[in-house]
Each structure stands twice: as structure tokens, then as C-alpha cells.
Amino acid sequence: HLQVAPKDFARMYNLSQALVGPVLASATNSPLLFGKRLWSETRIALFEQAVDTRKTGTHMRDASARVSFGQRWCEKSILEIYKEDIARFRSLVGTDLDEDAIDVLDRGQIPELKALRLHNGTVYRWNRACYGVRDVDHADGTKSRVPHLRVEMRVLPSGPTILDEISNTALWLGLMSEYGERLEDV
């Protein structure tokens, strides 16, 4: 996850989308080594199979898959992604939610948006837009809740070693940091 400023979200999300190809190409584990077949990259395929709720009948083939790279660039804000996901996909899981986000805002507090976050976790975009709230301890002893936005690169493969995983993540974070400062538009 990379935390980004709300004003920079669309640009940084698009940058992460543009970096998927080169980062995945450098991070992908080969299923072949010295003529032997090893384990292959299965992260995306696993999620495709696990959360694809489409029927196999021909009348449903035009429905969007819950696992996808995405359809278009993000133009202005994270809201575009959330609106699209809410409009296209039914909820897969539910929970008891006791938060009324409007009431929370009216009280001057930060809403958790648990229903949105739960739904967002069931739509598997290769780069996920994330909203969260964290507790902040201030030097004067007070505490506050601070909302934040993150971009999560979900296509990085697992293993084969922890060092490989850290290196792959460092590559993505380094590219995001460097090009995020240099490029105004992807």
C-alpha cells in the first residue's frame, strides 16, 4: 500500500496502473527452471476463480468480472472507482453496520465507511483504491482520527523468498515515488 494525498490520488492510481506491466514483468516467477516445472503465478487466477459470480450462460457473458485490470483511467478522484464498483457489483458479504456516515460527519467526526470498505475488498482490481482511518497520537497527549487514501498494488507475486517479495515491493514503491514526483500525467 502507498498512502497518497487526496488531490494526488487519480494521478498516482493511474501511475500504478501504468507500472503494472513493467513491475509484474520483473517480479514474475518463472514456472520453469533448469527444465523442471515449478509452481506458477496463481495470485490473480486464484482470485478470479474465488470471486467470479457471473453465470456461465451466454446471456451473462457481458457482465464485468470482479477481478480485472480496470476499464479506464481515473480522471478526478477515488469516487469514480467506488461509484463504478458499487454500480457494477452486488455485495458478496454483509455484516451488521451501525454507522450512519452522514450523522458521523454532522458530529464533526470521521466516518469509517465500513460497508464501502467491505464491498471494496470483494472487487479485485489489480490496483485497489483504499480508504482508511487511523488513530494519531499528538505531542500534547490528544488523539485524533485521520482519514487517508492508499493505492494497493495487488498483482505482486508471492515468494519464492521474503527477500524477493521485499525487492518487488521496493521496486514498485521506488517507481511510484520517483515518477510520482516527476510526472504530472501518465
Task: Briefly describe each language-model feature range.
Residues 1, 5-186:
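C-terminal accessory/tail domains of diverse enzymes
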